[in-house]
Amino acid sequence: MSDATNALVTGPPRSGKTTALKRTVSRLLEDGYAVGGLSSPECREAGRRVGFDIVDVASGERAVMARVDGVSEADGASNGRDEPCESGASAPTIGKYTVDASVVDRLAGRALPSAVDDADCVVIDEIAPMQLESDRFVREATRALELSTPVLAAITLDATDGFLGAVKNRSDTERFVIEPDARDALPETLAEWVRSRIRPR
């Protein structure tokens, strides 16, 4: 067994990174392990992807992270406690999406420290340009990667520079590339990887 404490799941866009992590989390929860962290599910309207939300894996709190037509307070969070959003030209854009970095700040500032302190496994879906618009996300993700709690993170396949490249080049990471002929077996492989690294609390 390697000494790596961070598993990076990577592959091309729409290769199944999020699905693999969701199925892995389900297996760990069924085993009675505590899992925390962040996920970034896509949002679709009339079959069209219109943006991404950000979700606290442990609490279920959900907020709007990015939208094609910009983000606004009206989008809000599912619990009605969303902070005022940036919007319009002042908000960062990634491709066609406008990103609300303040929402990522808020959820990353709660979900990731809580997961590091209290969970058996930290999930980060994903480490990608939208999330990196939040300095708080970068700080908390870095802290999670540096500590001993196992981390499962999705990361873009072609990332080689900056923070993304630095994460991929960490000596304490093990990379899992999604292959079409092994996709169905990957969640159990990842779950076993985590189980072997969970330390008694």
Task: Label each PLM-derived region with a short phrase.
Residues 9:
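Hydrophobic anchor at the beta1->P-loop junction of P-loop NTPases
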Residues 12:
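P-loop (Walker A) phosphate-binding loop of NTP-binding proteins
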